[in-house]
Each structure stands twice: as C-alpha cells, then as structure tokens.
C-alpha cells in the first residue's frame, strides 16, 4: 500500500533509538523525509546514515528536549531546511522511576520536562507549519497512564497528560484539518528495555513473567509494529481518524486478566 508520504517532512523526537528509530526508518521506506531529533548527534547521524542507505533523505538535529529553547530550535531547523512540516511524532521520554515515596518536587518537575512538556512545546512551535500542510501529530504514550505500575508517579502523570493532550489537540485543531492521535505502548522490545531487564537479578525469569501477561502470542511488541501504526496514522490513509488512543500492545491493557498464564 502506498501511504502517499513521499517527500513529506516528519519531525521525530527520540529518533535515534528504539521506537523512534523504527519510525524514522519506516518513514524513509515510504519516501518521507524524517527530521531525526535526539540529544546525541552521533546517534542521530547513525540513523541518518541508515536512511541514506535506503536511498532516502533525512536531517539530524541535536536537541535536549527538556530545555524549552532546544524544542524551538529543533522545529526552526526543520523549517530552515525544508520550509515545511507535514507531521510530528512526539516520542522522546524515559520511565525514570520518580515515585511518590522515592521522588521529590525537583525530580517530579524534571521528569515532566523530560516526558511531557516537550510534547506540548514541539507541537506549539510546529503549529503554524502543520496548519499550512494540514498535517498530522502522533503522540507515543504508555500503559502507565492507564494501568498504574508503582513507583513511577511522574512518568504515569506524563503519559496521562499525553493522552489528554491528544484529545484536547484533536478538538482544538479540527478547524485546520490537523489530525492528532496517540499510540499506547505496553511492553515493547527496545535496546533501552533490554538494558533495564539486564539490571535485574533474574532477567530471563522476569522477562518470561512479563511476556506471559501479554495475551497475543505471549511476546513483546516490536518497535517495527509501533512504527507501522505510526506511519499509517501520519498518512492520508487514516484521513478520518483523530483523537484516538490506539493500543499496540498485544491486548495487554484491555483483555481479560483470566488470559494470563499461571
């Protein structure tokens, strides 16, 4: 299926690793032009090179998105280079374990900057360009905004905020035909996730307990499965879809708990 994304300029935050990288490569395969935004330019450039190996075009933008000025500069770089923005994927973030007992005011606010506030700022600064292109926004979110996890107050609050902003923006941007949707991720296999698993005492046993709780095929979601949904939502093939929280999670959040293996 041709998603009609050829030469569309799409900004992807956290585009150098994991889900973001998979989205960048999926966009490139559709002929789109990804703007790879990440905190380490060396990592950004590696993914840019992968895009070029596919015969595509991309730019790499170094930005620490917890700094508001970097958000503005990242969008400006895309506009200075291409003169347009057709899509925005807000993806960057990290479950940093700021809990109710273990956290602090400073840690909680810092986590909101790392995980939520730049979602707003990137969309805010890209808005005029998205109005001009009648573009699309995809927010990557997490099950922690829905299910609770424990010891992750700030990240859960950020994901609840991401989901709320998705529907708020979908309403606000109706007059401009800008569609806004979110992809809710549960357990996705990424290098960051694998690094976390390896810090545990029994990584293989823990991973099996996790996958046993994923109803569809008892396996992790892949980054490519998230990416495939993202490029569809960015494309005009989803032209009447807005304000939706799309769960790409193997049934983790909503299917009956009785399906869990004992």
Give residue ranges: language-model regions.
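Substrate-binding pocket helix/loop in short-chain dehydrogenase/reductase
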Residues: 71, 99-112, 210
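Active-site helix of classical SDR
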Residues: 123, 158, 166
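Short C-terminal tail/terminal secondary-structure segment
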Residues: 147, 231, 242-262
């Amino acid at each position: 299926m041709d998603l009609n994304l050829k030469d569309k300029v799409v900004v992807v935050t956290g585009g150098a690793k994991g889900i973001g990288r998979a989205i960048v490569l999926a966009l490139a395969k559709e002929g789109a032009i990804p703007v790879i935004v990440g905190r380490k330019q060396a990592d950004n450039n590696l993914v840019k090179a992968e895009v070029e190996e596919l015969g595509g075009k991309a730019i790499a933008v170094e930005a620490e998105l917890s700094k508001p000025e970097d958000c503005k500069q990242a969008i400006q770089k895309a506009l200075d280079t291409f003169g347009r923005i057709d899509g925005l994927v807000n993806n960057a973030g990290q479950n940093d374990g700021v809990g109710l007992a273990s956290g602090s005011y400073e840690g909680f606010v810092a986590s909101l900057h790392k995980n939520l506030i730049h979602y707003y700022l990137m969309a805010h600064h890209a808005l005029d360009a998205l109005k001009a292109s009648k573009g699309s926004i995809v927010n990557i979110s997490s099950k922690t905004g829905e299910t609770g996890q424990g010891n992750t107050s700030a990240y859960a609050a950020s994901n609840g905020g991401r989901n709320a902003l998705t529907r708020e923006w979908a309403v606000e941007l109706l007059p401009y035909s800008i569609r806004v949707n979110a992809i809710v991720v549960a357990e996705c296999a990424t290098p960051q996730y694998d690094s976390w698993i390896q810090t545990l005492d029994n990584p293989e046993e823990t991973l099996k307990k996790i996958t046993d709780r994923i109803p569809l095929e008892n396996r992790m979601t892949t980054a490519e499965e998230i990416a495939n949904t993202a490029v569809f939502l960015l494309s005009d093939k989803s032209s009447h879809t807005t304000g939706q929280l799309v769960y790409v999670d193997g049934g983790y959040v909503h299917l009956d708990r009785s399906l869990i293996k004992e």
